[in-house]
Amino acid sequence: MLNSKEFVRELQLRHESAWMNPNVGSADAALAALPLTRTDVDDAEARLERFAPFIKKVFPETAGDRGLIESPLTEIENMRAWLNENEDAQFAGKLFLKRDSDLPVAGSVKARGGCYAVLKHTEDLALANRLVEMRDDYSVFATRAFRNFFSQYELHVGSTGNLGLSIGIMGAALGYRVTVHMSADARQWKKDLLRAKGVTVLEYGADYSYAVQKGRERAAEDARSYFIDDENSVDLFLGYAVAARRLKVQLAEQDIAVDDEHPLLVYIPCGVGGAPGGICFGLKQEFGDAAHVYFAEPVEAPCMLLGLASGLQNAICVQDIGLTGRTAADGLAVSRPSGFVGETVKEMVGGGFTVSDEHLFTDLHALHETERLFVEPSACAGFAGAVELSKMTDYLESSGLGAHWENAAHIVWATGGALVPEGEREKYLAN
């Protein structure tokens, strides 16, 4: 295993590499040290339940889940066999895909945090203006009167693509004026889709951090504008954390035990950190030390792992060590991590892995061939981490995971893909 200094050197060399967090402690101790608690996740979960009638009405594809924005958990035995045979993986337990790539509304994990942040702000405005009480039927938010009210307000967000889609789609459905500040990495089809929804898209020839800063500045100019801050938002974080509770139910439905003798290993693609950080926080609340969470990032944009391994969090960016931040995994093309997330998960996340763009496309193609499932490149990042961890015998032995390896359940969190146009899909699969 590499120490932190050696790992940073591997990052500079653009090698696919692994870092195991030396600071990870007990889940109880890590959670007790945080200002966020189970009560905060309770509150977020209850708010999503209140808005379910509205979501079901406006987004009928959610009717099967009663207006909840949720995705399937699918065992991918054929992909597991392919990884064992072609990438020398050593999987013994079951391998699952958490298909946030197919989340309704926005087709990515950002439908969790992004939609929740919009709904939280919406409820705050509605309560402050005495439009509703919490016991009311929230389907009233779909009426013309409510849409007219929210049209007085504007939402701003900086995004590489998927967060902008979730906030733009949900915000427009509620009647807001929405402006998405897009970095140079954003895909054209995502900009086109947002504009088709009536969202204003401002394009910048710079990276994600610059787009976020511009969004923050524009929102500050108008008292009726609200900036959804991907770098520092507690609301986004809690929206993602709710996912762990839903996952717990899905695992139980498939008779998957999670305890000390049946560890749960989860591999999550990471950009600025909000989604994987919130999910990690939620998993530790639900499963404690039986949950082992690992982040996966592109070799050119490993901002969160760089911040964690160096201990500098958001005081360092990937350009500081000679990397570009540019990657085909547009959702992960982030140069500087969230300091808020880094500080929150620094004693919870088990470690992380970097993956090349070429490897992403190999796994994207393999998933499609073996399981007939399509995800976008960034959503494949977790596979490389899962494979690498399975071969790290020293770490598995020292962490105690090796003793229960045959009982482990592995979840690769697929973060986006459902909205990718057919022409783009064909290009990805041909790459």
Predicted segments, located by residue:
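PLP-dependent amino-acid enzyme catalytic core
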Residues: 1-431
